[in-house]
């Protein structure tokens, strides 16, 4: 795992397959990596937070953009990747999503990938992506877009009931749209934030009053 701002990988799995852990981009590679909360305080193993990196391969800042530079570094000079994740007891990191894609419902942080994983487990679902939409009561509510497998069919009600059993009411999508395809970038990654346009705000009458 690497990003432009580090000019090199920050996490990598060992070459020995026996030391690799499935689903993890690996352990720190030539730098220091930590998980931190919203205030920049380090979190212990097993706790989800932002992946932050520090080391000689990290950029000094964005060219002629001091504002972006200040926003991207903590006061103790850790670069904020914007990726969310956690570290296990063996020191391996796991990525769970992006900070800007986090759903904040009623003050609770909900990773959209948690909803994605449940939807992907449905036998009729080919692709799925959860997003945050404005809500008058909670601030943000959960919505999701789904593409079904060829030859398969499923209703919105069936998908919502499937989620409620596995996630409970609070974390289940209030709205689901069935689409023919999901928008993707050049690398094939789903452009999650583009999906928001498919949903009107929840409780729009209340929100405008």
Tell where the protein language model's regions lie, with residue ranges:
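A short acidic, often aromatic-flanked loop/helix-cap motif at beta-alpha or helix-coil junctions
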Residues: 6, 183-184
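A short helix/loop element that forms part of the nucleotide-sugar donor recognition site in Leloir-type
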Residues: 66-70
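A short acidic/small-residue loop/turn micro-motif
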Residues: 26, 50, 101, 197-200
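Conserved ATP-binding loop and adjacent catalytic segment of the adenylate-forming AMP-binding
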Residues: 1-32, 44-49, 58-60, 74-76, ...
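Short, well-ordered coil loops that connect the C-terminus of an alpha-helix to the N-terminus
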Residues: 3, 31, 65, 75, ...
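AMP-binding/adenylate-forming catalytic core of the ANL superfamily
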Residues: 33, 39, 55, 60-61, ...
């Amino acid at each position: 795992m690497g990003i432009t701002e580090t000019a090199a990988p920050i996490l990598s799995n060992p070459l020995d397959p026996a030391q690799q852990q499935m689903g993890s981009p690996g352990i720190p590679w030539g730098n220091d990596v930590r998980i931190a909360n919203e205030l920049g305080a380090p979190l212990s193993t097993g706790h989800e937070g932002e992946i932050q990196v520090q080391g000689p391969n990290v950029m000094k800042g964005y060219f002629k953009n001091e504002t972006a530079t200040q926003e991207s570094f903590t006061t103790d000079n850790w670069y904020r990747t914007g990726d969310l994740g956690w570290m296990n007891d063996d020191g391996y990191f796991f990525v769970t999503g992006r900070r800007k894609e986090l759903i904040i419902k009623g003050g609770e942080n909900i990773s959209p990938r948690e909803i994605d994983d449940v939807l992907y487990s449905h036998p009729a679902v080919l692709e799925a992506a959860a997003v945050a939409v404005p809500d008058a009561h909670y601030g943000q509510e959960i919505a999701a877009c789904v593409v079904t497998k060829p030859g398969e069919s499923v209703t919105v009600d069936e998908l919502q009931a499937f989620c409620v059993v596995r996630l409970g009411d609070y974390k289940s999508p209030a709205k689901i749209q069935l689409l023919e395809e999901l928008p993707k970038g050049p690398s094939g990654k789903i452009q999650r934030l583009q999906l928001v346009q498919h949903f009107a705000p929840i409780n729009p009458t209340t929100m405008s009053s």
